[in-house]
Each structure stands twice: as C-alpha cells, then as structure tokens.
UniProtKB/Swiss-Prot annotation:
NCBIfam families listed in its UniProt record: PRK04296.1-4 (NF003299), PRK04296.1-5 (NF003300)
Reaction catalysis annotation: thymidine + ATP = dTMP + ADP + H(+)
Localization terms from the record: Cytoplasm
Gene symbol of the encoding locus: tdk
UniProt entry keywords in alphabetical sequence: ATP-binding, Cytoplasm, DNA synthesis, Kinase, Metal-binding, Nucleotide-binding, Transferase, Zinc
Pfam families the UniProt entry points to: TK
Similarity annotation: Belongs to the thymidine kinase family.
Record text on subunit structure and interactions: Homotetramer.
Protein name listed in UniProt: Thymidine kinase
Domain of life from the UniProt record: Bacteria
Length: 189
C-alpha cells in the first residue's frame, strides 16, 4: 500500500541527493518515477533539481495552482514513485493533491524539504505535510559552527544574521546556513 513520506532537513542536509539516489534505484530496475520541484526554486534553472555535490536532473515544476493529482493521473505510464523537491514551497492544495495521489492512485509520494524557515516558522507546505504524511523522517546534518545536530536555518545578509523579512528568498550556501539552536541565537559571525 502506497504512503506519503515527508523527509525534512535543514539546508545542506542532502535532501536533493537523496531524491536523485531514490530515482536512480527505481530507474535502475526499469521502474519509472516522476520528479517534481517547486516552480519558485529557480537557483539552477526552472524545473531543475540540483544537489550541492553537482548532480542534477530535470523535474516538473509545481506552481501553487497546479492540479498535481490530475497531472499524475493522466500520465501515459503510471509512475512507481513521485519524488518532490523543495516541498516547503507547496501550497496546502498541492499537499492535499499529493495525498490523493497516494490514496486514490496507490502511488507512493516522497516529499523532501525544509521544515521551518529562518524565523523558525513552518512553511505552508511543511505544515500540511506534517499533518498528512504517513511517515515523517528527519534528514540530519551538522551545525556549521559546532558540529552538533543542525535544527535551524540561519539567514545571513552582508555577513550578519537576519531574523526578519520575507519568508521566501531563494538562495544557497551564500544566504542560508544550517545551525543548532545555540548558534541560531548566537552565531559565531
């Protein structure tokens, strides 16, 4: 029976490389998958999932008003798995569509993304995945300053920590860093 998986981690925890690994494992056995990502994330191009170690693949971009359920249901070949990158940017309706893919089409969905933003608020997509997912797993990484488990994301602008501003600002290593709680409140900058 298919399930909805939510795998979250801070920046630089290996979420995208995990997607690419899972896709490779399915495809190596001749089982097609669908890789999707938020249309908001254009760091490496529109509709591209890209890991920090250099691996990348094309993906289907998801807009907030996309009917994901209908898109998957109308594919000529039923996928063995749907893999979602940057799931924190999904809308509530996107997440409910993913649950329908699992429940009505019996296709497993694995959604990967951040849980909380730089202000320690849940993203809309993360909130609804936490509510609806059958299985929730944390992908761990370490604090940039002390090597404890990183649980938060620190936004850095002009060499200084930022705790206010727009929730969504697409960036990479130069803007966001994984930190533990202690170094979120007292970064060693």
């Amino acid at each position: 029976m298919a399930q909805l998986y939510y795998k979250y981690g801070t920046m630089n925890s290996g979420k995208t490389i995990e997607i690419l690994k899972v896709a490779h494992n399915y495809e190596e056995q001749g089982k097609p998958v669908v890789i999707m990502t938020s249309a908001l994330d254009t760091r490496d191009g529109f509709g591209i999932v890209s890991s920090r170690i250099g691996m990348r693949r094309e993906a289907i971009p998801i807009s907030n008003d996309m009917d994901i359920f209908t898109f998957i249901a109308q594919l000529e070949e039923k996928p063995y798995c749907v893999l979602i990158d940057e799931s924190q940017f999904l809308s509530k309706q996107n997440v409910y569509d993913l649950a329908r893919v699992v429940d009505e089409l019996n296709v497993p969905v694995m959604a990967f993304g951040l849980k909380n933003d730089f202000q320690n608020n849940l993203f809309e997509g993360s909130k609804h995945l936490l509510l609806l997912a059958d299985k929730i797993d944390e992908i761990k990484t370490i604090c940039q300053y002390c090597s404890k488990k990183a649980t938060m994301v620190l936004r850095i602008e002009n060499g200084k920590p930022v705790y206010e501003g727009d929730q969504i600002q697409i960036g990479g290593n130069e803007t966001y860093i994984p930190v533990c709680r202690k170094h979120y409140f007292n970064p060693e900058i």
